[in-house]
Amino acid sequence: MSKLTKIGYDLDDVSIVQTPISPIRHRNECNPYRTIAGREMYPVIVSPMATVTDEHNYKTWLDNKFMCVVPRSVDIQTRLNLMNEVFVSFSLDEADSVFFSKTIIEDMANNPGKKIYICIDLAHGTMSALYDVCRNIKNVFGPSIEIMTGNVATSEAYSFYADAGIDYMRCFIGSGSRCTTASNGSTFYPRASLLDEINDARIKWENDHDKPAPTKIIADGGIKNFDDIQKCLALGADFVMCGNMFAKSEEACGQIVYINPEEFDDYLKGKVKGASEEYYHSQIKDLTNKLKESNTPERTKMFQNLLDEWYRMQPYREYFGMSCRKAQRLMGGLGNKTSEGISRPVPVEYPIAKWADNMKSYLISTMSYAGCYDLDEFKNNTEVIINFSGDKAYRK
């Protein structure tokens, strides 16, 4: 019997269809927010990546209406201190020990109404051990602890997540720009088809149990542009998780290096060096002062040329996957496991407030084209078509 009986479509293969009659007169009538962790936020979550979020900048994301997940590179005591305010990451072993400790059990018992938000952060989200740990946490703490976990690349996992009471399921494997799981390990499912099938699985679970499904769907990985966010939401995702988009913002926490864009490839090959942020600004200041003080045309020209060379350099941020060896060391490991991630700088392009405003504007515009007032309508009612020309027909 042939194994190749299914065809899968990725996000580039689909597009959203305009409704024939839209009741929406102006896009500002559309509501682009969802509630998560007790907050009204955009349906976009910041990935738990060491070069994007830490204990110093997580509030910046929250202030701009993006839920975030504090990564495992932050020390465990800090994560424990933050988990009633924001989602924080734990390994499976950490979750299995921490949340069945006497300290946590007594603290939750003595503080009724207290909420904790955790992300059990691992790549392989269909392990039976993961289901067992999540089910046990829910049996002890119920809705007091909200659990996010994953990742999954099969719609058949949805019923297991819902039965275990898991609140958020991260979907996609190997699609992130710094993840090499699919390219080296070959486990992958085209994302548009996966979301569509998982949404069908959610509807089936609700029909079988005659109640709303407890597990929200998070599309996680490889989001390149605003239209990818909209497609994921239209195909059934409740939230979309991004790393690259936030790494490119001024507010991300990763180290910045200044590089001449024309020499970027040579920088990656180690042929030229970049300049640290501190050194870059010191050189700009020093050369600017020398230019002001120059007293001959020759010196003026020399300092101006040097200053122009420095101004041609642009800020790039260190950006690596959380399974690469450097990330392994940041999370307390030896960094000697086979890497399933890569490191490659991204350009720093915008303040997050500007990106958020654009994301919101494009999202509510698309919602108005679909005739949907809120994100549930958008998820349930928007028509999506297979586009055999791919995104080449419109992506600029």
Locate each region found by the language model.
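Active-site entrance/lid segments in N-terminal catalytic domains of soluble metabolic enzymes
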Residues: 1-216, 244-249, 287-290, 294
